[in-house]
Design a protein with these regions (language model features):
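Generic detector of short, locally flexible boundary/turn motifs and exposed helical patches
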Residues: 103-114, 120-123, 179-184, 230-238, ...
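Conserved AAA+/SF3 P-loop NTPase catalytic/coupling segment centered on the Walker-B
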Residues: 266-276
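Generic detection of long, well-ordered alpha-helical segments
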Residues: 35-42, 46, 105-115, 173-176, ...
Length: 276
């Protein structure tokens, strides 16, 4: 019952998949988190407590208006019932007692054991397939809207897109000339190379593999390699990620599966430069 009540109030904000567990819609994208669903449950319990206290207040005021003495409410349940004079007082007392029972129930549920069990019981009601998340590889989510990379058209962010990531930047021409000057510095004004890198970055913004590319930024130190790629990674926000360079080598002997699992849904992954 409590799990259904929770989902009735928060169905639009919570989903669950087996690999990710709970995700919460934060207004911009679906955020994977163990703590946010707990916060949702705590907010739900706070609302229930406020509702119970309001019912107690309303039913108490009704009893007083019907002439019931406050001392009568301090009696044992049977004596309290016997003290009521007429059907109206009895009905008001039943409402008052039900409201107190409701509040006592809510107070008993305000602990982590109950919160976790309620969230677990709610799973079947908000269960989704992992394939539903980020299902359109051509959509990219930004702070001011979601853009279709095929058309360049933007629209308001929507929870129905099931997007789990967001960029740090919005489409804008602000600072464009500074960036163009930086590119000419990084790539020695080589237009063909700049055009190629632009294509690579464009491919990286798309959420599916159109071309299998491992880019190796080679060159002496302090020539802009890290500055360029770190800038792109910053723009892409949580669409980008990092990986240890040794995990890409054949001779890596440690377990890299957890590290690789963290890359799910990333569109650009950067490894620090190797020693050789």
């Amino acid at each position: 019952g409590e799990a259904k009540a929770l989902i009735n109030g928060y169905r639009a904000d919570l989903i669950y998949t087996e690999p990710t567990e709970y995700l919460f819609y934060n207004g911009d994208y679906w955020e994977e988190s163990k703590q946010l669903p707990v916060a949702v449950m705590e907010d739900f319990l706070d609302k229930q407590l406020a509702d119970a206290e309001k019912q107690i207040e309303d039913s108490y005021n009704l009893l007083m208006s019907l002439g019931v003495q406050e001392s009568d409410l301090m009696l044992t349940p049977k004596k309290r019932t016997d003290a009521m004079n007429g059907e109206a007082q009895l009905e008001a007392l039943q409402k008052y007692e039900a409201a107190n029972t409701y509040k006592n129930f809510v107070m008993r549920t305000r602990n982590m054991k109950y919160i976790n069990s309620t969230l677990q019981a709610a799973v079947p009601m908000v269960l989704h397939k992992i394939s539903e998340l980020d299902h359109d590889p051509y959509l990219i989510n930004t702070p001011d809207g979601t853009y279709d990379l095929r058309t360049g058209q933007g629209r308001a962010n929507s929870k129905d897109d099931f997007i789990t990531k967001q960029t740090n930047a919005i489409p804008s021409d602000i600072g464009k000339q500074i960036w163009l000057d930086a590119l000419n510095t990084f790539f020695l004004a080589d237009k063909e190379l700049i055009d190629y890198v632009q294509k690579v970055v464009g491919l990286a913004a798309i959420g599916c593999v159109l071309s299998e590319i491992l880019v190796i930024a080679y060159g002496d130190g302090r020539n802009g390699k890290s500055t360029f790629w770190n800038t792109i990674a910053h723009v892409l926000g949580i669409y980008s990620g990092a990986i240890s360079a040794d995990s890409l080598t054949v001779g890596c002997k440690r377990n890299v599966k957890p590290e690789l699992a963290e890359l799910k849904g990333k569109r650009l992954v950067i490894a620090a430069e190797l020693e050789e």
